[in-house]
């Protein structure tokens, strides 16, 4: 008999391999050195924290990044691309492990501090094994949708 009923995964650094140097290099290639200096996967800068908290939209965050770096010509799409460079891959072996848990009757969920732009890239990564993200999880809890950030107690309720 299974005593484990549910496994909750994080995305960045757990399921999704990250490359901070690739991300900061992408921002620097856009002339956004000031933004590159703020990138940290585990301790987001205040502005990125507000984006992940769902307090500001992606467009509003882009406006702040352009102001901060003095690059009004950089588009939202370019910023999304640069931010997406953080996200490398989801190894297929991890997807198969999630499948194995589900085959044993274990519920699988995601709880992640994230933002809408990154989620577009992440959702595509789940298709590497021919499925969608929703095929792997019973529930997906994202900070920007819940308007709460880990590790706050409220996000776990």
Give the ranges of each region predicted by the language model:
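N-terminal helical cap/lid subdomain that shapes the substrate entry/recognition surface
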Residues: 2-96, 103-104, 115-116, 142
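Generic structural signal for well-ordered alpha-helices
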Residues: 95-98, 156
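Structured helix-beta-strand junction loops
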Residues: 104-105, 136
């Amino acid at each position: 008999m299974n005593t484990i009923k549910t496994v909750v995964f994080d995305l960045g650094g757990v399921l999704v391999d990250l490359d901070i140097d690739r991300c900061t290099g992408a921002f620097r290639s856009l002339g956004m050195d000031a933004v590159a200096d703020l990138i940290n996967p585990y301790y987001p800068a205040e502005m990125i924290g507000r984006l992940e908290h769902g307090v500001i939209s992606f467009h509003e965050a882009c406006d702040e990044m352009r102001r901060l770096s003095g690059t009004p010509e950089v588009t939202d799409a370019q910023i999304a691309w640069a931010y997406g460079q953080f996200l490398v891959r989801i190894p297929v072996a991890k997807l198969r492990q999630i499948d194995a848990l589900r085959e044993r009757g274990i519920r699988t969920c995601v709880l992640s501090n994230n933002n809408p732009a990154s989620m577009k890239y992440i959702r595509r990564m789940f298709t590497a094994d021919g499925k969608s993200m929703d095929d792997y999880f019973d529930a997906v809890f994202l900070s920007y949708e819940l308007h709460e950030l880990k590790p706050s107690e409220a996000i776990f309720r």
